[in-house]
Amino acid sequence: MRVIRASAMGVCFGVRDALKVADTVAQPVQVTVYGELVHNPLVQQRMQRRGFQQFGEGEHRDAIPDTPHVLITAHGISQRRAATLRDAGKTLLDTTCALVKKAHAAAIGLRDQGYHVLLIGRPGHVEVQGISEDLYSYDVLPDSAAVKTYHHHKLGIICQTTTPSARALEIRAAVKRKNPHAEIKYIDTICQPTKDRQLAVEDLLNQVNTVVVVGGKNSNNTRQLAYRCHERGATVYHVQCADELNPQWFNGVEAVGLTAGTSALPETIETVYQALLALASPPGVADVDIPWPANPQRKNRSTKFRLNMRAAVAEDGYFEKS
C-alpha cells in the first residue's frame, strides 16, 4: 500500500501563532480561554493540564470570566463582546487570526455602507457568531437551499474563512438568481490556507480512492475536507489521532491519501503517517515528503499573503464589486 500525502495540509499560520501565544503564558491559572483555542481535543487537553481556565462556545458565552486575563482564540470575537470584557476590567490576549480579522472588517464595512450582510458559513460556529454579533441586518447561509428573495436593495456577501470555494460560488449564484433587483457586493474572505488545502485534496483525490483526514471532529475546515472526499466518491476516514486508525480499513487498498485540517498538529500528522506506513506491505512510500507549511516556498507565499491582507483591510479600495 502506498501512502500519499497532500501537498498542503495541517496547521496554518493563524493556528500556529495562537499556539505560540498560549505557550508564552507564564501563569495559565490567571487566564481564561474564551472558547477552544483551536478545534483540536489534544490541544484542549494540553491547555487544561497547564491550568488554563476554559469557557465553552455555547450557553455560558455571555458570562464574564473570573480570571484577570482572557485569551481570545484564533476564531475571534465581536467588537461588542471584546468591549464588554474590557469594561469588566479584563486584559485581552488576542490571538485572532489575521484573516478572520479581515472577514470581520469586511462585514463591518458592508454594514456601515448600508448592506444587508449574507454570511456564508455554518450557523452556530464560533467564527460566524463573532462576525454576526457586530451586524444589525444579516442572514447566515449554510448552503444554497437557505437562499431566499430579500426585500433589501443592497446585499453584501462574505464567507466564513473555512468555507469551500465551490460552495461559496454556488451560494453566490443562488443569491444573484433570486435577487435580480438588488445591488450585490461580494468579498472573498475565504482564507488562502483553506484554499490551498482544498486544492491539494482535489489533486490527492485524482490519485487515490481512500483518504485519511486528520483533525478535530468539531473543526469546520477538517470536516469540509472529509466531506469533499466523500462527495468525490472516496472512502474517507476522519480521525483525531493515530489510535483511531483501524487496520481493517485498509485491507485490499493499494494507495491511501493523507490530509489534515488546519487544527491538526504536525506531530499528530506525523504519527498518523508513520502508523499508515507500518500498515503498508511492502512498506509505504510518500509521494510528497514535505507537507505545507514546512515547504519554504509555500511558507514565503503565505507570509506575503498575510502581510497583503493586513494592509488590504486598511485600504479604501479593498471592497470589490461582484
Predicted feature residues:
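The feature marks the mature, well-folded catalytic cores of soluble enzymes
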Residues: 1-322
